[in-house]
């Protein structure tokens, strides 16, 4: 095998590895800052300096010795440290094929190595890396323990609920004693006066029991509803704070299905399961009285409890697997349904309704089948519980009758004992019958945790700088969307001056739109810096940045609100004059004025009530209304008719006045008047200059594209 890396730039490998690993943990690191602090002589970062540098960026780094067979159990990605300086990053291990995915720090590309190849380059030194944020994230992850702080928050209410539960158990204890007195004393001695007293007392106990039970349910439901509101609010805030990459890697329907699992948790919190748990916790009160009546009968009841537990343990793994399958099928249905409704125009235009219906029928059948299997297994579980209950009842009846006949127990005591045992067994049976709900809520918490445990965009500690001027610099940019994905941008250097209008053209997939995503801080480059007014965006607060950049895409989404609300989306209290001014700049005021309700016209879902050109002009007005210093047009006019495009281009000079404008376009006519035109090909800038200058190079890509559009 050839050496993994050459020694050409091995001094930079440790530095580059730290930058990449820090970015993985959403921590912006400046290579120049590391060099200045930890490698001032340029000799390369040694191990001690590397660990200190990591610590300075709130990363917890630890060097350990590991054998190859222990690597699958470590937290990845990790840095494989080599004595010769040829370090590399281990990102993933496929234990089935015994292959290793590494990131080559020389070629700056991922590589897949076999076990033999990996063994040749692995020296046993591993640097494990975690961030304090990730450690805190693990401690604060969403699972059953999330509810503990919520319970502590409402501890006074829950203490009151527990006190009420104790009183309910005491009332439940009194009722069997009354029945015993009636059977053993009143009936034998024909004591009508005693019967009347006991009946009145029993009625009072029943009334108190009903009132307390209703009060407990009300208070408990009220508290759990507040927890439900907090969870729902936290979920939505967290969902909106997730990075763009989270949504790009998941289907919309799958995310919706996970969010809908909140309903399952809500039903669990407000249902009978938790009150049954409380009843079970306080049922120990009955055992002392039951033991007083008959130790033998009490032992039978006690022996039945492990049977319920064993049956639940036996059936739980099977039920959980089937619930998992049911969720997966339901998520597939949700995704397909969302996709079908979103693409309804295409489906009808292509007349593929029968094919889509066929797919839906198959997926629906799979879901119904999975749901049926869950129901069957849950029924088997409930019948097993019933079998144990009936068996215990028969044994107690037989044994109790023997004790009565032998004189060890009175009839009243036997009846009272059975009533007491019923109070003990009832919550156990309810919990066993509700075991499916427990399994379901466990699945729901796991699925919802996929959303709530996903790391959000890191805003803490980021700089909120003054209003930007508009100087933009892309410095040595190298970027890919995933570690094992192809390079999208490679060694891109571009400087845009304040107030300059830049056109960016090139074939599809050349990296044009990716540049603007980096400018909006949706992603952090693998290498290099994106600067605005000399400030590294990796260190800037994304919200501060995005509020000062206006963006118009090819397919803009309007919300189901009025035109005014859509234009003033960032500030609903915005003066109407400011809204109208932006609409005039975008060439939208005239057609809005002709509408029946003007600016109060509802646009429909995703702007369905407007034409494509009208939607685009409203989107431009929305981008302009805050007077951004940087404006991005990403294929903003490519889907417009010529009249709508002409209206926008006519106002372009006024729109661009005093701003830095980046126009990405396939139509070269859109960028002809730009101050400079950047031509991109396969992630590189291959040409730059004015329209007339680029046409002079007849071997250039711009000339070729211009000739194609002139035909």
Curated annotation (Swiss-Prot):
It comes from the Bacteria. It catalyses: ATP + H2O + proteinSide 1 = ADP + phosphate + proteinSide 2. CDD domains: ABC_6TM_CyaB_HlyB_like, ABCC_Hemolysin, Peptidase_C39_likeA. The keyword Transferase does not apply. The chain crosses the membrane at residues 157-177, 195-215, 273-293, 299-319, 392-412. InterPro entries: AAA+_ATPase (IPR003593), ABC1_TM_dom (IPR011527), ABC1_TM_sf (IPR036640), ABC_transporter-like_ATP-bd (IPR003439), ABC_transporter-like_CS (IPR017871), ATPase_T1SS_HlyB (IPR010132), P-loop_NTPase (IPR027417), Peptidase_C39 (IPR005074). Residues 1-129 form the Peptidase C39 domain. It is found in: Cell inner membrane. PROSITE patterns: ABC_TM1F, ABC_TRANSPORTER_1, ABC_TRANSPORTER_2, PEPTIDASE_C39. One of its GO terms (molecular function) is ABC-type transporter activity. ATP binds at residues 506-513. Residues 472-707 form the ABC transporter domain. It is an enzyme of class 7 (translocase). Residues 158-440 form the ABC transmembrane type-1 domain. Keywords: ATP-binding, Cell inner membrane, Cell membrane, Membrane, Nucleotide-binding, Translocase, Transmembrane, Transmembrane helix, Transport. SMART domains: AAA. It is a multi-pass membrane protein. Its EC number is 7.4.2.5. Part of the ABC transporter complex PaxBD involved in PaxA export. Transmembrane domains (TMD) form a pore in the inner membrane and the ATP-binding domain (NBD) is responsible for energy generation. Belongs to the ABC transporter superfamily. Protein-1 exporter (TC 3.A.1.109) family. Homodimer. This is Exotoxin translocation ATP-binding protein PaxB. It comes from Pasteurella aerogenes.
